Amino acid sequence: MKLALQIYTLRQYLGADDIRETLRKTKEMGYEGVEWPGLMGYSPAGLAKITRDAGLEMFSVHINMDDVIACDTDVMDGLAAEGVKWLPIGWLPDVRLAGGELFEETCGLIRKYSAEAAERGLLVLYHNHDFDLAPCGDATRLDALYAALPGDVLGAEPDTCWLYSGGVDPVEYLGKYADRAPVIHLKDCVKEGGRKGYKPVGSGVLDWDGILPACEKAEWVCVEQDDPSDGLDAFRCAAKSAAFLKEKLGK
């Protein structure tokens, strides 16, 4: 299991003048790879070079439904050539989730995109949010999505904070979908007065002694903190998460 940072965590420091130094600092914290929230205006080769130059692996790049609809096989070819393995869909709007009027259409579009991706050795994943855990029949909308699309068409990228704030047990859900989750987002949080607050991993309310063993089948665990907290900037939050996880994982 390798340790990565979803670089969205440091999104304020990814401008052309900052990106290389940001990646250098990410490597210095002890991260082995980064997951990109998109191509950031670069070509696949250009983004991969910047990542590799910092000593980091580029293993996963997020996509959205516009990308799925466009189904650009040239981009897929470029990503596959650079060693990317996974293309997580970052989120789906309500109308495209189970129970929404475009759910069946969405499943068809994902099947088409996934088939092209699979020909290139890429697997499409789905990154959940709390709204994906809304009830749908006897299960949740996330369950319904995974029931509609098998794991070789749509894998999982579970997010621990969103599972928790969505009202399910992260440990239980990680176990439930362990066989289709090669990448897992590790995110900590608190709930104060019904409001969610992000925290460095190990600083919130999540049960890491239960969560980390439940991640053992994953190839990558990926820290993400949407906004900094505790009076720390985003770099210090990411470093604090890395230090906690390196100790827990024996890295």
Where do the model's predicted regions map?
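Active-site beta-loop-alpha junctions enriched in small/polar residues
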Residues: 6-10, 37-39, 62-66, 92-94, ...
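Active-site acidic/histidine proton-transfer and metal-coordination neighborhood
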Residues: 24, 33, 57, 65-156, ...
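Domain-start "cap" segments at the beginnings of catalytic or binding domains
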Residues: 35-40, 44, 51, 66, ...
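Histidine-acidic metal/acid-base catalytic patches
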Residues: 1-29, 52, 78-83, 136-155, ...
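Active-site-adjacent beta->alpha loops and helix N-cap segments on the catalytic face
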Residues: 40-50, 96-98, 102-103
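Generic beta-strand hydrophobic packing signal
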Residues: 34, 59-61, 184, 221
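Short acidic, glycine/proline-enriched helix-loop-strand junctions
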Residues: 43-62, 122
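Short, well-ordered alpha-helical microsegments
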Residues: 43-45, 72, 142, 208-209
